[in-house]
Amino acid sequence: VFHYRGNVTPPKNPSDWALLVTQLAEHWVERYGIKEVSQWPIEVWNEPNLSMFWKGDQAAYLALYEATWQALKAVSPRFHVGGPATAQNAWLPEFDAFCRARHCAPDFLSTHYYPTDAFGEIGADTATQLQHAPPGVMRKRAAEARKIAGDRPLYYTEWNITSSPRDALHDGAFCAALAVKLTMSVDDLVDAWSWWVFSDIFEEDGMPSQPFHGGFGLMNLHGVPKPVFRGFELLQRLGTGRWQVEGSHDTVTCWAGDGEWQGKGRDGSAARPMPSAILWVNVAMPHHAIASESVRLSIPHQGDHRVKAAHATRIDETHANPRAAWQALGSPVYLSPAGVERLQVASQLVDEVHSVVADDAQTWVELVLPPQSLALVRLEWS
């Protein structure tokens, strides 16, 4: 769309469009089998509420959706079809009402949202947009969408901390900390949460050459994982089970998860799961107050089990920060293979032994969180 000038106009002949969709769907079924393709969530179009992606109006999009839905379902009712894939949570009530009236109910609801959308002044720099983004805006928008989706899956198929392809905020620990906090804020509302985008290679906006230029990828041009990539890695290590954590702070948030629990009872039998991973973030929007914070968490003993050791993994200015390693090389525009390898090493997560203190009832875990950082502490139980 940006460089290749893709056609974003409504179909001139709806019948021709339906035939195209039908033949494409039949090809998928023939090549991959209905068992496979029925697992593919198929969105109809992308951000039709933005003129750069769709030259028609809302009515034209809804007609396109209906024609596409009918064509796909005619090939197989097992196809999963949804939308409206709009930017900024737009058109969700209208889309839902139309689908109900026309009996073309989506199998899932999808939309996009960025925290910078909330400020509403597109021309403002992203730091200012984030500064003025209302607290909890991503959860608020997800809750609105969840109400409309009902029991159907809700997919946010595009998000990031900003929508800019050139923003230095994307390359540092702030991005990782904010991404983790936003992800956890909607964990109970959203079924899929898709980061835009995997790589900084985004030639449609002009092919970049500088290894760190503020691209919105999880990895830089050379495939070096950026801090946000590692942030999602720590989220995976947190596990899917949750334990309640009591306490609050303006910039620090904490979650307890089951991690990779491998505990056994004293008789060798499998013991009940316990919190084995603690994830902290210390993050504030640009131009808001933030400082290093000393945090302390007490973990009660669980019957015969108690925390016997801990390891901490950090993401901050001195941990998992390949941009700092690049700057230490003199910020070269073009990297040698050896330079790329140095950045790969600098991007790695490092587990460090972390001391704990215990009494007869509980174990205490303490650490200092620098501004705009996150840390995961893995607990080992006896």
What does each model-found stretch correspond to?
Residues 250-306, 310-328, 371-378:
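Carbohydrate-binding surface patches
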Residues 1-31, 37-39, 156:
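Substrate-binding cleft of extracellular glycoside hydrolase catalytic domains
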Residues 21-24, 58-193, 211:
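Noncatalytic carbohydrate-binding groove/subsite architecture in carbohydrate-active enzymes
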Residues 42, 46, 157:
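Active-site flanking residues adjacent to catalytic metal/cofactor-binding acidic residues
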Residues 302-360, 364:
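Acidic, Ser/Thr/Pro-rich beta/coil linker or hinge segments at domain junctions
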Residues 356-382:
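Beta-strand-rich recognition/accessory modules
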Residues 1-15, 48-55, 119-127, 164-170:
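Surface-exposed, active-site-proximal loop segments in enzymatic domains
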Residues 156-266, 270-290:
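Aromatic/acidic polysaccharide-binding cleft in carbohydrate-active enzymes
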